Amino acid sequence: MNHLGDYDVIVIGAGHAGIEAAHAAATLGARTAVFTMSLDAIGNMPCNPSIGGTAKGTLVRELDALGGVMGLAADATYLQSRMLNKGKGPAVHALRVQTDRKRYHEYMKHALELTPGLAIHQAEVVGLEVENGRVKGIVTQLNGEYTVKCVVLATGTNLGGKIFVGDAWYASGPDGMHAANALTESLKAAGLPLRRFKTGTPARVHRRSIDFSRLECQPGDPDNELQPFSFMTDAPMHNKVECWIAYTNPETHKIILDNIQRSPLYGGMIEGVGPRYCPSIEDKVVRFAGKDRHPIFVEPCGENTEEMYLQGASSSLPEDVQNAFYRSIKGFEHIEILRPAYAIEYDCVDPTSLEATLESKVVRGLYGAGQFNGTSGYEEAAAQGLLAGLNAARNALGKEQLILPRHTSYLGTLVDDLVTKGVMDPYRMMTSRSEYRLTLRQDNADTRLTPIGREYGLVQDDRWTKYQHTQNILEAERRRLHDAHLRTADLQAAMTAAGLAPAAEGGIAEELLRRPEIHYDLVAGVIGWGEGITPMLAERLETEIKYAGYIARQDRMIREVARHEKTLIPEDFEYADLTGLTLEAREKLARIRPKNLGQASRIPGVSPSDVAQLSIALAAHT
């Protein structure tokens, strides 16, 4: 073995989780290295060429507010931008962009190269060195040894990766990368509770083989309505491409059903559990037998490639069946498949074996992020990566680690779900998972999280200065709207011009904005736009005012829950002695070892009566 270096933090993997982990750790001043099997795979998008979406867009904004990289990268490399769910309430508005996957990789690679204090190594990590229950080093395929204080595992689908297409399978990571099998054995030897999950991806096809005249066009939002992901992005935005929608049909479904036993999933070859909320096309046809069609979103992979991505049509059926069912779709009659669809099975950890800091309970100093923790999605991975990298660095530097409660963020909700409830299939963030989604909107992520990022060392001076400037603008406008009075004649004229029934009388701007039909631009047409107020900030202020009553109610809920969060449970608390608890509750509490009464109350199988008994026991214990 050749000793080659010593670091505070080593990150294994440079996908979406690994990038954020490495950047965060180095930004905090930890001596950091990131290891990847290929520099050409940094920030790779092996599945959909997009960032954001429902709930995921909020995660990206939260990442950015904390000082992460993903939002900036998405803004620099987007092709088309759309705000989803605009017809619904602001709690579920979600920014999503199509991304140039090659430019995204190049942006992220360069971002890591420019990060001070970060070393980048192309090498496969084949083992961990663990002593007395704590990680001490790593070993590479070339017999290189590095000593380390903390390690972040961000292995994606490479860990024990196995690809399936029909009855063919081979060991592999995504996009032709080789699988990391030796590391799996090292993790098992260290005692980590591993399991098998699987995911899939659709075919990539040649643009020239699609008859777009037979598809529905899906344009982006008007250029004057586009919003960036990053609170640091000021450059004007414009859409560069269009996306399209095709549909399966009964013939497509018949081809799939006639060949369903040739699917490795239905033929029993695949052991891993697949994602519930991103099923393969064969899953959709079987599970939703009453549906005559399913949409397929046709998305470009970049400006300088002819590859098109078929979102909604992932499959593990054999190539001949793929050719047949894709070509049965209107507009795809002459489709040319460049890369066949496939399923990939991989190793991940039971996330209930992790602390809320994302540190392993089994091996101290070892952190997990992304698909290793049982999640799916680039955004979920990146958000965990930032938290894991930050905490690994603070652990290595002897500083307090960060735990984000559920009420602070979607990231806090995601982590709490993972470590408290666990997962039975790849976890995807959704707005319905948060009980506080009206206060956890994508527009206020900076207010919620940038002060935390600053306190914990991630938010740099330029971001902090801009944050303070934005908050000053918002506060000044809140005061102005609270004081400004609109005369009846002026308000009636503005409403008539907007095609609205005129109000009976004028009033204070803030009170008028509580009405559903009155919007900021109408009020501003009378009293003028506030200094520094952009359409994006105007929408944010209007949401705060219109939903003030609901937001206040959620704030009261948060304060009530916080009381339980403050009731701490000693690490060595003995649940077996609490005969008032059900057997299931005792077993789950002893296994998960919640940090406080609030977390205990969210464990599946722990009832309100169990929580009440535990509360009494804790009071007696103190």
Predicted regions and their residues:
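Extended, charge-enriched "interface" segments that sit outside catalytic cores
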Residues: R433, T439, A445, T450-A612, ...
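Internal hydrophobic alpha-helix adjacent to the cofactor/substrate pocket in enzyme cavities
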Residues: A381-L402
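An anion/pyrophosphate-binding glycine-rich loop and adjacent beta-alpha core
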Residues: S38-D40, K56, M83, T184-N323, ...
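Beta1/beta-strand and adjacent pyrophosphate-binding region of the FAD-binding site
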Residues: H3-A17
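Conserved N-terminal/central alpha/beta ligand/cofactor-binding core
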Residues: H23-E131, L142, A154-A171, H178-L183, ...
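Core beta-strand elements of the Rossmann-like FAD/NAD(P) dinucleotide-binding domain
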Residues: G5, Q141-C150
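A glycine-rich dinucleotide-binding beta-alpha-beta segment and adjacent secondary-structure elements
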Residues: Y309-T375, I403-D416, T534-K588, R593
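Glycine-/small-residue-rich beta->alpha transition segments that form the dinucleotide
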Residues: C150, T155-L159, L317, K330
